[in-house]
Amino acid sequence: MIEINQVNKVFYQGSKEIHALKDINLHIAEGTIFGVIGSSGAGKSTLIRCVNMLEAPTSGSIVVDGVDLTKLSKKQLSETRRNIGMIFQHFNLLSSRTVFDNVALPLELAGKDKEQIQSKVTELLKLVGLADKHESYPANLSGGQKQRVAIARALASDPKVLLCDEATSALDPATTQSILELLKEINRKLKITILLITHEMDVVKSICHEVAIIGGGELVEKGTVGEIFAHPKTELAHDFIRSTLDLSIPEDYQVRLQPTRVAGSYPLVRLEFTGATVDAPLVSQISRKYNIDISILSSDLDYAGGVKFGMMVAELFGNEEDDNAAIEYLREHNVKVEVLGYVL
């Protein structure tokens, strides 16, 4: 449905070249929800703007539903964009128009008659849960309701693709989840392909079938959500997965943490479990095998793409040789171990 082939994008500041995208290759299958995640400045917003040619790639091709957008005239591109809906972080609603009229705008511009507009807008407002808000104005809506209006407007032209540019980042957690559930429902009911960008791994975990991780304008890693969470190959992927779990080191431990091991101190470790390692009794195994005591300070477990993953912060109480052997045993069994320091 969407093919991004060897796409590069260069911006210029005077004589300075800024490479926002570097040789990006992605294939997004029809009917999937595909996430692109990256930190601020990673290039993800530039990428999604290239997909509907709001930004023209410096080189490479963008193919949507078999049509190479980079080869179209302005008139052809304008017509083709009707197959591509887009929603934004800040909604972009017209404050002087009612909810009904905001959703009707693309239909008016397409020359639809009043009867067609009435029928389509009523159907869409029902779909997004705003059937009772026809005559309301944006100023009287919550953030979540405004985004629902924006989604309805984006669907007015019956697009085959819906682009979501940080669509939930301005919303509170509960509202974010309700918007994600709505997007899942739209994907299921309308069979529409959804490409969304985000800086939050929780969004990817909640809604996406596949994900690409972007850093410094480059494609770092891609795969199904289950694959990425079960077998992250890069440190950036580990960082994003870690961000979905709430693990904090108690303040009294932080002040006692030493960078090197001294007499009377013990290692504080962060353990990352993915896939099969989550269910394996590895912690009890190292306790028995190496005769060490283990104090668990915090732990968290979650699911994504049908895969369990979890993290744990623990203190190991043994002699230095046994502690090191236990850490090596965990690593040999595909647990990522980070020694955070030594607690005195």
Curated annotation (Swiss-Prot):
GO molecular function: ABC-type D-methionine transporter activity; ATP binding; ATP hydrolysis activity
Binding site residues for ATP: 38-45
Membrane-traversing stretches: none
Listed EC numbers: 7.4.2.11
Protein's cellular compartments: Cell inner membrane
CDD domains: ABC_MetN_methionine_transporter
GO cellular component, one term: Gram-negative-bacterium-type cell wall
InterPro entries from the UniProt entry: AAA+_ATPase, ABC_MetN_proteobac, ABC_transporter-like_ATP-bd, ABC_transporter-like_CS, ACT-like_dom_sf, MetN_ABC, MetN_ABC_transporter-like, NIL_domain
UniProt topology in membrane: Peripheral membrane protein
Reaction(s) the record says it catalyses: L-methionine(out) + ATP + H2O = L-methionine(in) + ADP + phosphate + H(+); D-methionine(out) + ATP + H2O = D-methionine(in) + ADP + phosphate + H(+)
Domain named ABC transporter: residues: 2-241
Entry annotated with the keyword Cell inner membrane: yes
Pfam families given in the database record: ABC_tran (PF00005), NIL (PF09383)
Gene3D superfamilies in alphabetical order: 3.30.70.260, P-loop containing nucleotide triphosphate hydrolases
Keywords: Amino-acid transport, ATP-binding, Cell inner membrane, Cell membrane, Membrane, Nucleotide-binding, Translocase, Transport
Subunit structure of this chain's protein: The complex is composed of two ATP-binding proteins (MetN), two transmembrane proteins (MetI) and a solute-binding protein (MetQ).
Family: Belongs to the ABC transporter superfamily. Methionine importer (TC 3.A.1.24) family.
Function summary: Part of the ABC transporter complex MetNIQ involved in methionine import. Responsible for energy coupling to the transport system.
Protein's UniProt name: Methionine import ATP-binding protein MetN
Source organism (scientific name): Vibrio vulnificus (strain CMCP6)
